[in-house]
Amino acid sequence: MASTTTMRLALFSVLTLLSFHAVVSVTPLHVQHPLDPLTKEEFLAVQTIVQNKYPISNNRLAFHYIGLDDPEKDHVLRYETHPTLVSIPRKIFVVAIINSQTHEILINLRIRSIVSDNIHNGYGFPILSVDEQSLAIKLPLKYPPFIDSVKKRGLNLSEIVCSSFTMGWFGEEKNVRTVRLDCFMKESTVNIYVRPITGITIVADLDLMKIVEYHDRDIEAVPTAENTEYQVSKQSPPFGPKQHSLTSHQPQGPGFQINGHSVSWANWKFHIGFDVRAGIVISLASIYDLEKHKSRRVLYKGYISELFVPYQDPTEEFYFKTFFDSGEFGFGLSTVSLIPNRDCPPHAQFIDTYVHSANGTPILLKNAICVFEQYGNIMWRHTENGIPNESIEESRTEVNLIVRTIVTVGNYDNVIDWEFKASGSIKPSIALSGILEIKGTNIKHKDEIKEDLHGKLVSANSIGIYHDHFYIYYLDFDIDGTHNSFEKTSLKTVRIKDGSSKRKSYWTTETQTAKTESDAKITIGLAPAELVVVNPNIKTAVGNEVGYRLIPAIPAHPLLTEDDYPQIRGAFTNYNVWVTAYNRTEKWAGGLYVDHSRGDDTLAVWTKQNREIVNKDIVMWHVVGIHHVPAQEDFPIMPLLSTSFELRPTNFFERNPVLKTLSPRDVAWPGCSN
């Protein structure tokens, strides 16, 4: 039995925010919110409506995207104010390939009818379906030239698995749905991505579902399976380093409430949505102002709009690997079920959702999202020794709310968190794990390297290829209303030349309001600046405009030339921050159709309109990037590599909003006495 003192110290980290406590309630039966994800019944209704028009008996029909058609913002805001008086019809946007043509279909579920049905004639194709990829990866295993290549390498065909990779666009005039197929050895390890079969080019046509291009160029060694297994059941002692168990105890239950997809916690309220392309969507984030006695809107909607992953190997083996994980594979379709007590702590609450197959059938995705509280840090503190004969110590415990989901696209796992703080901050973060993209080589030691490998030798015969991860967040701020502005406050050095001070210099600030979208293209560098979205129509008691500041992630800038084909498609990474006039249809930074796209429908193209953004409904886009130079510690599976940014209130409140917040009090463990 631990001592009482030890127990109290341990209980200090108990995740019970008693000052804002509410018992959790996950309510399965609730009034549907206009932004709720599609239900099983809605997916089935969409499937039926489309198949009634295009019977599968005489049409080749595949659903590539089924998602909520965003309601008009003013309708949603009126619903928030008067939910019983405002009725918003559920409209569903469908992208389907029917007889080799891409259809954009809008369905009104209230009247169970197709409102519009248009054919996309431009460049690019929709998200790849899981079904067609599953068929394509089997093609090499029955393809005689590939079977001959396997025999030539002395490999066992039954121990080979293949994977599909989008091909991008490199100036070709043809507009055909093709993928590259790379194959790997699964013999003696499930860690297939570290055992590539190098030197073979395989291209498959997804519409014809056959191999249309094949080259066996050269033979490189297949990296060994030794020390690559990551399944604990396949590993043997010694294990380590040893970790001791940590237990959290919430005797009065969690401090948050879930009603359908709406979450209340501490002073925050927000909605959790889900989309087969975007994955998790945070909407209608409002915070309660204790002094003003009302909730105040901060963020109308936020999600990851795109993830651009360009590899930096220009050779035949890798040049095409310039992936757009959201637009080509779907963040929602790639979301995985969270593992209780591993991906999320024991006290987490889980939310299920649905995605769809290529034939439109809904697929239950259990534990897609988890919500939990965790001890954060110190909320605020001060020790005052300046008053004679008095010693003053004040400190407050910080407990934060986390909303988490994990997206696994091929070899990489993306842990996506939205962290809410009672102090008013929202902190989105990304943590990467998974497997490096490995290129096989005959080189076993660094001393053998005679040319640029385009990566690092992380193990014998294994090159971890240089690459980037560029996430772009869509952040539709509504600071106390829809009319906002974007301000850049630069910190300027001032020299004192008149001898009025013993100092020779100081710094001050200079604020500029971006008038147009061009003014709001920001490259974050060495020059310090504050980037703030303000409501110019509402001011604090002392006259400051209320606002929220972006504390950006550590900046990463694209290193490809602007005329390189991948960078043309990923031109939204040219700046770290963009601000655009709100347009309901401008959701995807890489364009609606990303596979084989040509960069003609991206954030970089939209902003050429140079629309006015002063005192308008505006959207901020923040690029969060990581230049990944692989290291041996990333092999055979990499520990989490994380980055984050913060949306922090700036003159939004009259004073510190958590000044009167009480720390969670110590509680007794069951079965233990004080």
Swiss-Prot record:
The active site is at D325 (proton acceptor), Y412 (schiff-base intermediate with substrate). Binds 1 copper ion per subunit. InterPro entries: Cu_Am_ox_TPQ-bd, Cu_amine_oxidase, Cu_amine_oxidase_C, Cu_amine_oxidase_C_sf, Cu_amine_oxidase_N-reg, Cu_amine_oxidase_N2, Cu_amine_oxidase_N3. Disulfide bonds join C162-C183, C344-C370. Homodimer. GO terms for biological process: amine metabolic process. This is Primary amine oxidase. The keyword Signal applies. Belongs to the copper/topaquinone oxidase family. Glycans are attached at N156, N389.
